[in-house]
C-alpha cells in the first residue's frame, strides 16, 4: 500500500525525519501499540502531502537550528490543526520557529539523565513519573517560547519539556523512542492515542484483509503476477499473501544459484510448493552462476555478477511460463520492507553505498512490468507476525536472514565449488549446534565464513596447513545496529571441534566479536 492508501484506512501519525539515528525507532514504538506511523523527510512540503495525519512528530537530528544550512520544517504543519511533538532537535525547532533563542549549552548531555516532571497535569506526562531518559544533545533552548509552559526539567535542561496546550504543541529534549528512556513508550502512547486520538487499529489481522483486497483490485480478475522466492521469510510471506489473493495467477520462481544453504532448493520446493500450495517453479542454474564467478575475488563484482545473472535466468524462465488465460504477465512481486523505504527517503537521503543490495529492480525495466510491494509498509517483526497468520510454519517465519548473493559473499576470495562446499558444511554444523542448544530464536543471524588464509595445524601426528572458518552471530532488533552474541565458551569449543573434525580443509575456527558499527553483519 502507498502512504495515501494506508492513511485512508488507518489513522496515521506523521514522523518528520531530521536525520537522527533514532528516527526509525519512533515509527516502531508507535506501531507497537497499534498506531500506524509514516516517516517522511523533514523537507516534506505539506501542500504535497495528499493525506492528513492525526498528529506530527518532529524527530531529533545532528544539526543546530541556528546554523546557516540547518534543515527546517515547512511551517504549514502548524496550520494543519493537529497535535505536534518535537523530540530533541524537534523541540529546538519549535522554539526557533517561535522566535526563541537556541544556542550551544555550557555542558553536553549524552546518555542517561533523570527526568523531573514539573507539570503532572500535562497530558503528555500522564502516568510518567520522575524517571531515567536518554539525552543526546549539546544545544539547548535559552528561553521559554511565548505561550508555552515548562512541563519537565533535568539537571542540565531547564526546558526538558515544554508545552502550549492551547495549540497542542509539545516539546521534549530527550529521546522517548529508545529503550533507555524507561517510560518513553508511555509518553509516546499519551501523545498518539490520548492527545492525537489516533485509533489503535493497526494490526496484521486488519492488514491481511486490507492488503488482499487492494491486490485483487490492483491486479484485476485476469492479470498474472510473477515473483522470485528464496526460501527466506520476506519472499515467502509476500508469495503466500499473493497466493491468498489471486491463487495460481501468481507464479513463483526459485533460482538455485549454486551458493545456497545445504539442500536449500529441495527444502524450498517442499515447503513452499507442497506445504503452502504456492505455484512454484525451481530452476537449477548453479553451473551458470559458478562459471561466471570463476576468478572473481572482489565482493562488489561478486554481487553484481550474481545480480545480473539472476535477472538473466529469471527473465529466461519467466518467458517459459504460459498463463492459463493466454495473457501476458503484467506484474512483478517484490518483498521490499519498510527499512528499505526509510533508507531511501530519510533526510540524509540515499547513504553512501556500503554494499550493493541484491534485488530484482532491473527486472522492472527489462520486462516492462508493474511493481507490487505488499510488504513495503512493514517492519521485520510485523512480517513475521503476518507470516504466522498466513499459516506459514514458525520455523520458517523465524528463520535467520540469508543474503541474496548467498555463500558467495561468505567465501572470501574466489568462489569455487570446493570452497562453497567447505563454507556450506561448516555453516550447517554451526546452525545445527545452535538449534540443539536452544539458542536459534535468541540470535538474529548466524553464519560461517571461509577466510582466504591458511593456518598451520596438527592432526594426529601430521602437520596440516589448511583454511580458517570465522563464525558470526549477532543480536539486533532492526539490523541497523547489532551486537555480537555472547556464546558460552563451551559451546564455541564444541562447534569448533566438530567443524575441524568433520569439514575437510579446515584447520582453525575463530569467533567474530565485532559489533555493527563499525563492522557490517556480513564479511563482504
UniProtKB/Swiss-Prot annotation:
> Catalytic positions?
88 (nucleophile), 175, 177
The UniProt GO MF terms for this protein read: ATP binding; GMP synthase (glutamine-hydrolyzing) activity; GMP synthase activity
Top-tier EC class: ligase
Which residues does the UniProt record annotate as the domain Glutamine amidotransferase type-1?
A: 12-201
Has UniProt tagged this entry with the keyword Ligase? yes
Cofactors needed by this protein, per the record, are: Mg(2+)
Chief site of localization: cytoplasm
Q: Write down the Pfam families for this protein, in alphabetical order.
A: GATase, GMP_synt_C, NAD_synthase
| Domain GMPS ATP-PPase: from-to ranges | 202-399
Q: List the catalysed reactions.
A: XMP + L-glutamine + ATP + H2O = GMP + L-glutamate + AMP + diphosphate + 2 H(+)
Magnesium in keyword set: yes
The pathway it acts in is:
Purine metabolism; GMP biosynthesis; GMP from XMP (L-Gln route): step 1/1
Q: Where in the cell is it found?
A: Cytoplasm, Cytosol
Alphabetized InterPro entries for the sequence:
Class_I_gatase-like (IPR029062), GATASE (IPR017926), GMP_synth_C (IPR001674), GMP_synth_GATase (IPR004739), GMP_synthase (IPR022955), GMPS_ATP_PPase_dom (IPR025777), NAD/GMP_synthase (IPR022310), Rossmann-like_a/b/a_fold (IPR014729)
Q: Keyword annotations for this protein?
A: ATP-binding, Cytoplasm, Glutamine amidotransferase, GMP biosynthesis, Ligase, Magnesium, Nucleotide-binding, Purine biosynthesis
Binding, ATP:
230-236
| Enzyme Commission code | 6.3.5.2
Q: Which GO terms describe its cellular component?
A: cytosol
The Gene Ontology biological process annotation of the record reads:
GMP biosynthetic process
Q: List ligand-binding residues for XMP.
A: 303, 461, 516, 522
Q: Which cysteines are joined by disulfide bonds?
A: none
Binding partners and assembly: Homodimer.
Q: What does this protein's UniProt record list under function? A: Catalyzes the conversion of xanthine monophosphate (XMP) to GMP in the presence of glutamine and ATP through an adenyl-XMP intermediate.
- Recorded protein name is GMP synthase [glutamine-hydrolyzing]
Amino acid at each position: 500500500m502507498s502512504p495515501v492508501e494506508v492513511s485512508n484506512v488507518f489513522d496515521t501519525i506523521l514522523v518528520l525525519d531530521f536525520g537522527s539515528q533514532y528516527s526509525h525507532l519512533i515509527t516502531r514504538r508507535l506501531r507497537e501499540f497499534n498506531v500506524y506511523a509514516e516517516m517522511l523527510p523533514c523537507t516534506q512540503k505539506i501542500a504535497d502531502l495528499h493525506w492528513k495525519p492525526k498528529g506530527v512528530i518532529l524527530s531529533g537530528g545532528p544539526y543546530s537550528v541556528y546554523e546557516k544550512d540547518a534543515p527546517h520544517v515547512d511551517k504549514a504543519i502548524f496550520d494543519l490543526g493537529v497535535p505536534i511533538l518535537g523530540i530533541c532537535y524537534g523541540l529546538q525547532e519549535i522554539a526557533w520557529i517561535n522566535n526563541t533563542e537556541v544556542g550551544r549549552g555550557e555542558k553536553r548531555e549524552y546518555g542517561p539523565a533523570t527526568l523531573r516532571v514539573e507539570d503532572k497535569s500535562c497530558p503528555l506526562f500522564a502516568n510518567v513519573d520522575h524517571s531515567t531518559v536518554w539525552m543526546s544533545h549539546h544545544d539547548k533552548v535559552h528561553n521559554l517560547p511565548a505561550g508555552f509552559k515548562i512541563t519537565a526539567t533535568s539537571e542540565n535542561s531547564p526546558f526538558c519539556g515544554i508545552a502550549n496546550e492551547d495549540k497542542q504543541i509539545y516539546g521534549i529534549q530527550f529521546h522517548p523512542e529508545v529503550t533507555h528512556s524507561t517510560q518513553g513508550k508511555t509518553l509516546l502512547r499519551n501523545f498518539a492515542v490520548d492527545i492525537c486520538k489516533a485509533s489503535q487499529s493497526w494490526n496484521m489481522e486488519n492488514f491481511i484483509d486490507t492488503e488482499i483486497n487492494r491486490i485483487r483490485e490492483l491486479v484485476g480478475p485476469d492479470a498474472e503476477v510473477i515473483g522470485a522466492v528464496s526460501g527466506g521469510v520476506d519472499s515467502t510471506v509476500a508469495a503466500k499473501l499473493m497466493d491468498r489473493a489471486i491463487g495460481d495467477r501468481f507464479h513463483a520462481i526459485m533460482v538455485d544459484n549454486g551458493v545456497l544453504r545445504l539442500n536449500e532448493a529441495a527444502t524450498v520446493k517442499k515447503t513452499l510448493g507442497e506445504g503452502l500450495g504456492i505455484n512454484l517453479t525451481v530452476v537449477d542454474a548453479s553451473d551458470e552462476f559458478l562459471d561466471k564467478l570463476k576468478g572473481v575475488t572482489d565482493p562488489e563484482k561478486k554481487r553484481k555478477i550474481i545480480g545480473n545473472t539472476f535477472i538473466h535466468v529469471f527473465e529466461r524462465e519467466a518467458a517459459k511460463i504460459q498463463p492459463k488465460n493466454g495473457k501476458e504477465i503484467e506484474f512483478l512481486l517484490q518483498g521490499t520492507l519498510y527499512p528499505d523505504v526509510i533508507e531511501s527517503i530519510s533526510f540524509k537521503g540515499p547513504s553512501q553505498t556500503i554494499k550493493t543490495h541484491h534485488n530484482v529492480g532491473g527486472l522492472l525495466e527489462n520486462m516492462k512490468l508493474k511493481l507490487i510491494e505488499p510488504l513495503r509498509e512493514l517492519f521485520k517483526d510485523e512480517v513475521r507476525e503476518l507470516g504466522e497468520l498466513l499459516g506459514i510454519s514458525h520455523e520458517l517465519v523465524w528463520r535467520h536472514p540469508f543474503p541474496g548473493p548467498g555463500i558467495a559473499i561468505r567465501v572470501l576470495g574466489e568462489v569455487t565449488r570446493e570452497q562453497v562446499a567447505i563454507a556450506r558444511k561448516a555453516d550447517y554444523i554451526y546452525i545445527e549446534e545452535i538449534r540443539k542448544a536452544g539458542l536459534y530464536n535468541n540470535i538474529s543471524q548466524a553464519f560461517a565464513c571461509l577466510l582466504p588464509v591458511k593456518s598451520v595445524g596438527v592432526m594426529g601426528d601430521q602437520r596440516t596447513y589448511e583454511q580458517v572458518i570465522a563464525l558470526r552471530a549477532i543480536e539486533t532488533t532492526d539490523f541497523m545496529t547489532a551486537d555480537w552474541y555472547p556464546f558460552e565458551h563451551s559451546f564455541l569449543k564444541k562447534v569448533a571441534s566438530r567443524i575441524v573434525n568433520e569439514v575437510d580443509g579446515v584447520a582453525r575456527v575463530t569467533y567474530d566479536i565485532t559489533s555493527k558499527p563499525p563492522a557490517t553483519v556480513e564479511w563482504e
